[in-house]
Amino acid sequence: MLEFNATESRSQPSRRDFLNLAIASSLGTIAPIWDSHEARAAGSAAVPLKLGLVTYQWGKDLSLVDLLDVCKRTHYAGVELRSTHRHGIEPSMNAAQRSEAKKRFADSPVALVGLGSACEYHAVSPSVVEKNIDETKAFIDLSAELGGSGVKVRPNGLPSEVPVEKTLEQIGKSLQIVGRYAAKANQQIRLEVHGKGTQEIPNMKRIMEVADHPNVVVCWNCNPTDLIGPGFDANFDALAPWLGTVHIHDLRPGKVDYPWPALFKKLKASEAKGFTGWCLMEDGATPPDIPAAMLENHSVFESLSS
């Protein structure tokens, strides 16, 4: 069990957070309440796949105005705004800045898919975990205010001095707290498959089993580790019930060695209730002509998703 020495408030986690969550779960009172047009309802048709951009690295140097313009011109329907980039969308924004950003998205055909935080919950120190939970809540509030539908978070490693299972449970219980908070704001918590050790599929599955909240979903990250052990199909299927969003990489031939046709076959058949359909371009290699690369990827995406 995590130990927090915080007073109870809307932004502070406590032991009672865990207790109340356990009670609510046992009574069946927790339900997904994010926008129904982005989540799959039981028995509905497959969710259409949509191409968006993560500002890492292709959009990190663009202002919000330029970012929306480039996405519009290259037919990217949405954007996940990674924290600390030039767009300036941060929890520290004042009311006027938030109002302006909200209007920018309202006036654009490009949707705010959500915010990409670096919040993580694996630290040995409870105070550090608590700080990350508080930061996550601030990102949730901002995403909801600006019209987004979720916040990306991540696991980021397994401290060597702590048993692996204990760290996985700590991450999962922290996700329960932020997932419960996100539900009140119609937001998802999107856990990126990330981090040394934590990105291994059995560990991610364990984290999600502990989290056990409908507003906590997986952001499939298209990692090389997806292909180890039992292979892509089995690894994807292990996390498929929790699928929410996808971070894809450069789809052009010869760029990234990944089974893209197999992935898109899985995505088109997804029955995950939290799957939004968003496939978000995130690639660490910066092409010399980013808009041209985006257009070329859009063409490949259309072929793979049809």
Predicted regions located by residue number:
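Histidine-acidic metal/acid-base catalytic patches
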Residues: 2-52, 61-75, 198-306
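Active-site acidic/histidine proton-transfer and metal-coordination neighborhood
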Residues: 17, 22-32, 43-45, 68, ...
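Active-site-proximal loop/turn and secondary-structure-junction residues that shape catalytic pockets
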Residues: 57-59, 83-85, 119-121, 155-159, ...
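Short amphipathic alpha-helices and their capping/turn segments at secondary-structure boundaries
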Residues: 65-72, 95-107, 137-145, 233-237, ...
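Catalytic domains of carbohydrate-active enzymes, especially glycoside hydrolases
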Residues: 67-84, 147
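Short acidic/polar active-site loop segments enriched in Thr and Asp
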Residues: 77, 111, 149, 276-277
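Conserved beta-strand positions in the central sheet of alpha/beta enzyme cores
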Residues: 80, 114-116, 152, 247, ...
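Glycine-rich, proline-tolerant flexible connector loops at the mouths of alpha/beta enzymes
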Residues: 82-102, 156-162
